[in-house]
Amino acid sequence: MSFPYFISPEQAMRERSELARKGIARGRSVIALAYADGVLFVAENPSRSLQKVSELYDRIGFAAVGRFNEFNNLRSGGIRFADTQGYAYSRRDVTGRQLANVYAQTLGTIFTEQAKPYEVELCVAEVAHHGETKAPELYRITYDGSIADEPHFVVMGGTTEPISTALNESYKENLSLADAVSIAVKALGAGVNGAEPRTLGPATLEVAVLDANRPRRAFRRITGSALEALLPEVDSSESSNEAEAGAEKGSGES
């Protein structure tokens, strides 16, 4: 007589966690950090069409790492939820904490009930409405639905330890935009285990801000000459080689 294969709940959760962590580890890193005028997002992303950073609502931004199709579905769902809430009640009733909780509940349900967890990690950020002085809010949501608020910065992706170490050494409150971009880009290029730091140029970076000084929609992308002016000096040939080596597939990790 044969017996059905049994796996304990603890082992099932461990295997799901391992699967999700491996998927996230293959993605290039993203930084979200608070600066003097709001929140800065800097992602290592050579693709111009598959974006890791986007706007969710008037004062709320979104960043993610992992499988693009999965976090893009979550991004789209968050936008629809925010639009519905803002239409039914008031635009000011839509908050970053509210959206972070929705994402946490969704990912927690997927992790425990579906056959495969989402291989994603998310950040939801919010800045104060124009004229208010509330500090920026940063929320990290992991693949299993865990949620944490971070006071200064969030680092996500495959190589987070050297990036977090670099930011802990260089980050200060109320940085200017230029200084914030500089330390974020240098942190993204930090070497692992003593390796030489990498030089990242405009071709390999996706940069955006939530600017609390903007009257309604705070989200703004920084591209082209505006981005080049904020970056440390880079060698153009190195930047080009970095972009060619980092070409990504649309269905894979981002």
Swiss-Prot record:
Modulation of this protein's activity: The formation of the proteasomal ATPase ARC-20S proteasome complex, likely via the docking of the C-termini of ARC into the intersubunit pockets in the alpha-rings, may trigger opening of the gate for substrate entry. Interconversion between the open-gate and close-gate conformations leads to a dynamic regulation of the 20S proteasome proteolysis activity.
Domain of life: Bacteria
Pathway given in the UniProt record: Protein degradation; proteasomal Pup-dependent pathway
Single GO molecular function: threonine-type endopeptidase activity
Keyword Cytoplasm attached: yes
InterPro entries linked to this entry: Ntn_hydrolases_N, Proteasome_alpha, Proteasome_alpha-type, Proteasome_asu_bac, Proteasome_sua/b
Keyword Cell wall biogenesis/degradation: no
Cysteine disulfide links: none
GO biological process, alphabetically ordered: modification-dependent protein catabolic process; proteasomal protein catabolic process
Family assignment from sequence similarity: Belongs to the peptidase T1A family.
Subunit structure: The 20S proteasome core is composed of 14 alpha and 14 beta subunits that assemble into four stacked heptameric rings, resulting in a barrel-shaped structure. The two inner rings, each composed of seven catalytic beta subunits, are sandwiched by two outer rings, each composed of seven alpha subunits. The catalytic chamber with the active sites is on the inside of the barrel. Has a gated structure, the ends of the cylinder being occluded by the N-termini of the alpha-subunits. Is capped by the proteasome-associated ATPase, ARC.
Function as written in the Swiss-Prot or TrEMBL entry: Component of the proteasome core, a large protease complex with broad specificity involved in protein degradation.
Name by which UniProt lists this protein: Proteasome subunit alpha
Protein's organism: Mycolicibacterium vanbaalenii (strain DSM 7251 / JCM 13017 / BCRC 16820 / KCTC 9966 / NRRL B-24157 / PYR-1)
Name of the encoding gene: prcA
